[in-house]
Amino acid sequence: RELAERLLTFPSPGRERPRLLALHASSHHTSNTMALWAQVQSRLSPRWEAEEVGLRNGTLSDCSGCPYTMCLHFGERGGCFYGGVMQEAVYPAVRRADALILMCPNYNDALSANLSAFINRLTALFRQTRFYEKAVFALVVSGYSGSDTVARQLISALNMNKSFYLPSNFALMETANAPGEALASPGIELR
């Protein structure tokens, strides 16, 4: 609820319905992170226009470290050497979005491989587009601990490195293990 309220009070960039891009690499069936997202998303309508992009099952190749000039060459043309879902779906969605929300299950105190690949591959788009006017939010679910570590990774990668701005209390962090456990946490409907 609190995260939804923060999104609802997000300053509109001159649009009646700001655009929110939700990125995840999780299974809807078993994911506590996605269950929390469904709860947050249900509170956003009709004020926000939300678009969801899934980055799982081998759809996203990580950056392999192109030379700077090659990354710059493709980035200035709105693409990336590796193409795929990043160039076809993610880059256009990031361009349209006023804010991003990342669903981040905590895997060993780190972002998932697919979300890390998203951040790495965002560099090519950053060559052409600055993100100063785009906010970043997060849902972080950990089995035991480390949500703060994952949130710090997002701050470092997206706020400090890629220039997304960081609203106060940008992340909802929860601890859950078994599927559905996050929604049973005391007071979760208020956070």
Each language-model region and where it sits:
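Glycine-rich phosphate/pyrophosphate-binding loop and the adjoining helix
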Residues: R1-R47, D62, G79, K162-R191
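Cysteine-cluster motifs in flexible loop/terminal segments that predominantly coordinate metals
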Residues: G58-Y91
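Short, catalytically relevant binding-site loops at active-site mouths
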Residues: N57-L60, Y107-D109
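Fold-independent oxyanion-binding glycine-rich loops
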Residues: A25, L55-R56, C104, L122
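Helix-loop-strand module that forms the ligand-binding subsite of alpha/beta enzymes
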Residues: R1, F81-N161
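A short beta-strand-loop structural module common to alpha/beta enzyme folds
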Residues: E49-G58
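Short hydrophobic segments within beta-strands
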Residues: L21-A25, V53, L139
